[in-house]
Swiss-Prot record:
Cofactor: binding details: Binds 1 zinc ion per subunit.
Family matches, as InterPro entries: M14A-like_propep, M14A_act_pep, Peptidase_M14
Function per UniProt: Extracellular metalloprotease that contributes to pathogenicity.
One GO process term, biological-process aspect: proteolysis
Active site per UniProt: 385 (proton donor/acceptor)
Gene Ontology cellular component terms for the protein in this record: extracellular region
Keywords: Carboxypeptidase, Disulfide bond, Hydrolase, Metal-binding, Metalloprotease, Protease, Secreted, Signal, Virulence, Zinc, Zymogen
Propeptide, residue positions: 18-112
Binding site for substrate: 179-182, 237, 254-255, 310-311
Coiled coil: none
Signal peptide: 1-17
Organism from which the protein derives: Trichophyton tonsurans
Every Peptidase M14 domain range: 119-419
Name of the molecule in the record: Metallocarboxypeptidase A
Amino acid sequence: MRSVLSLALLAANVVTAAVVSPFDYSGYKVIRVPTQKDNVKEVQRIITDLNLDTWKYPKSEGQNADIVVPPSQITSFMERISGMSMEMMHEDLGMSISNETSFEAYSAGYAPDINWFKSYHSYQDHISYLQDLQGLFRTRSEYVDAGKSHEGRTIPALHIWGSGGKNSKPAIIFHGTIHAREWITTMVTEYLAWSLLSQYNKNADITSIVDNFDIWVFPIVNPDGFAFTQTSNRLWRKNRQPNPNARCPGRDLNRNYPYQWVGPGSSSNPCSDTYRGAQPGDGTEIKVHIANMKRIASYHGIAMFVDWHSYGQLFMSPYGYSCTARPPTDARHQELSRIFAQALRAVHGTPYRTGPICNTIYQVNGDSVDYALEVLKVKLSLTAELRDTGARGFVLPADQIVPSGEETLAGTVAMLKAVIRG
C-alpha cells in the first residue's frame, strides 16, 4: 500500500494516512439514469456502445442505471441521454475516492472503541483490530484464522459466545466484504461484533442474544480483492484468482457457490464482474467458507446466515436464482425482514425495502443465501444491501459508518429477539 502519514498524532492514538490508488479516477463521473419502458433499451445500448462500466445495470424497466463515465466519454454520453432524467452521484469520482481513503491508521494494542468507526482502514489494520478486540474479551470470544485466500491472506473471523460456552448453541453467521469494493460492510460487521462483545452484561437484549446463539463474524470474506481495492483499483469487485486462458482475473464469489450455479444471474465471461468461475465452488475463498460453515453447522446447526452487501438499502430473503419459487419458510423470512427494516428505520429514519432477492434487486445464480438455505439447511438465510440508495454508492463517506452501524445493530437485535421468541 502506498500511503502518506501525517506528522501529527491524533487524540485517538491514530495518524492520518492517505491511500492513493494507481488507477486514477480523476474526472470520472458516476451518473444515475432512471429507466422506464420507453428508454430502458436505449440506456442499455448507450452502455454497450460506449463500453461503460456500471455500478447498477438496468436489466429491466424501472431499474436505475448507475453508470461510470470516463472524461473521454462525457460529451458523447451526455448527448446520448439528452432528454432523459439523470442524477449526478459523483461529479468527480477521483476526488470522492481521495476523500474516502484518508485512512486513520490503527495503533496495534490500542483498546478498541468507537473511534475505530470514524474511518475506513487497511486490511492489515483490520487484522490487528480484530485481534485486539478479542483480546479484551478472552473468556467469551476467540479470534480465528479461518483459512487462506488465493494469495495467502488470512480470512479473519471472530467467534463470540455467552452462557454455556463456545459451540454450545445454534450458530449465527455474518459475512462481510465478499465483494471487495463494499467497504461499508467490513465496518458494519465489525460494529456488530464490537457491540455484541462490549455490551454483553450491560444491555439485556444483547446479553440474551449472545447467550442464545454461537455467533461467528467474518468481516472480510474476500481479503485479496479487498486489499486490491486499497492498492490498485478502488472499484474492484471479484477475488484475485487467475482464470486460465483469460486475460481477466477473478471470480465473483457470490456467483460461485455450488447451488443453481448456471443461469441468467451470473456470467460465463471471465471479464464480467459477475463471472461465476470455471466450476461450481472453485473459488479458493468459497472452498474455505463452505468448509467453515459445514464445521460450524456440525455442532448445533446454523440458526441464521446473513451476507452483508452494499448498496441499495435492502434486506432480502431467498431465492436469488428464481423470481417465482419460494422456500417453505418464506413467510417467516418476510416477517423477520420487516422486523429488521422497521427497527433499523427507527434509529435514523433510513428506509429499507424487503422481499425475495430475485424480485427485489435482480436474479442471482450461485449465491450464498440460496446455498446456505438449500444445501447447508440453514434455518434462516438473508442478505442486506447497506447504505445508501445511490447518492454516493460504493464510495460511501466515512461519516456514514457509525450511523450505518447503529441502525444495522438495532435491526439485527430486533430480528434476533424475534427469532428467540419463536
